[in-house]
Amino acid sequence: MAEPRDTVVLAYSGGLDTSCILVWLKEQGYTVIAFLANIGQTEDFDAAQKKALALGAKKVYIQDVCREFVEDFIWPAVRANALYEDRYMLGSALARPCIARHLVLIAQEEGARYIAHGATGKGNDQVRFELGCYALCPSIKVIAPWRMPEFYQRFPGRRELMEYAQKHGIPVPVTPKAPWSMDENLMHISYEAGILENPKNRAPLDLYTKTCNPTTSPDVPDELEIEFEKGVPVKVTNTRNGVTHRSALELFVYLNDIASKHGVGRVDIVENRFVGMKSRGIYETPAGTILYHAHLDIEAFTMDREVRKIKQGLSLKFSELVYNGFWYSPECEFLKHCIARSQQAVAGTVHVSVFKGQVYVLGRESPHSLYNEELVSMDVQGDYEPADATGFININALRLKEYHRLQSKVSTKQDE
C-alpha cells in the first residue's frame, strides 16, 4: 500500500484496462495524474479527458506529440531503412520512447515518484516503456499492474474487469469488442491476440482499418516525387494534380492518405518478441512503406558500395535495439550518429507509383549520384578498359581454384 500522498503518472489510453487501473491505483492510495499522448491515433481526446477526471484523476495531460514523433523518431528509422526481422517497420516500438519521454517530463514537473502503464506482462511494450523511463530518469519507480499478482489474480480475464468497471462507475464499451487487440499511432496500426493467436487463421477482411483492400483500390495509380536531403524526406509532390507538402508532419500524413487509398503497407507476420516467445502480428504501415522503398532507392543511388554494406549492418542492429526498447541506450545513440553520418550525401528525388498495394520506383535523380551513365554504357567505352577485367577475374578466381584443388584431393583420399 502506497502512502496517501504518493503521486503516479499513468500512461492513459481511455480504454477499459487503463481506466480500471486508474481506479485501482486510487484504491491503493495513489494520487493519479493521467497522461494521454496524441500520437496520431483515432481518439475522442475530450471525452477521454472527462472520463479520467470523472474516475478521480487529479489532473489530465493531453499532448499532441505527432510532429515530434515524425521528426525525432520516424525520420531516424527512415534513414536507417529500419526493419525488424526483415518485415516489421517498428511502428509501436518507435512510439514508446516518444511517450516515455513525456511521461518522465510530466513526472518531473509534478514531483511524482511513480510512473504506471497498462502493458501486459507477456509483451514488448512493458520493456520499452520501462527502459525508456529508467534511462531518462534513473530514480523513477514503475508500477506495472499486469505483473503484480494482487492485480492479475484479481482480474484474470475481461469479465472481471467489466464487473469491476460496473461496480466503480467506469463507462464500459457498448459495442462488441473486436476479437483481437489493436494499437494505433500515426505510423501504423497493429492487430494481435484473440482469433489471430492461431497463426493458421486468415485475418478477416474487416480487420483492416488504415488501408483499403488492394483488390478494390483505385484503378489509376498516384505518382509521387519524393525529395530527400541527408536521408530525410523534405518534399512530396503528386505529379498528377500538383499537390505539394514540405513540412514533416504534413508530408507524412499525406503519404499515409495516398498509401491508404491504394492498400499499401499491409503485412502479416510471426515475429520473435524480446521476452522470448514468438507472436503473430498484423500491421498496416502506409506512409512508412512508401518511404522505405523511396529511401532505399536514393540511398543505393548515392552511397558508396562498401559504406552501404557497413550501414546495412548498422541498420540491422538499430532495428533490433529499437524493437527491444533500447532507444535511449548509448549503443543506439552511437548507431543513430553513425547512420546520420552515412546520409550526408543521400539527397535527390525519387519518382514512385503507388498502385494496388504496391510501390513501384519509376526513376530517380540526385546531385550526388555515383551513377556514371557514360562509364556503365554498353555503347561507349569511356574511361573503362575492358582488358583490365581479365586480371580482376584471375585474381578473384585464385582463391576458388585453390579451394577446389584441395577439395579434389580430399575427395580422392576418401574414395580410396
UniProtKB/Swiss-Prot annotation:
Pathway info: Amino-acid biosynthesis; L-arginine biosynthesis; L-arginine from L-ornithine and carbamoyl phosphate: step 2/3; Nitrogen metabolism; urea cycle; (N(omega)-L-arginino)succinate from L-aspartate and L-citrulline: step 1/1
GO CC terms: cytoplasm; cytosol
Subunit and interaction comment: Homotetramer.
Family, as annotated: Belongs to the argininosuccinate synthase family.
Organism of derivation: Gallus gallus (Chicken)
Modified residues (Phosphoserine): S181
UniProt name for this protein: Argininosuccinate synthase
Domain of life: Eukaryota
HAMAP family membership: Arg_succ_synth_type1
Keyword Ribonucleoprotein: no
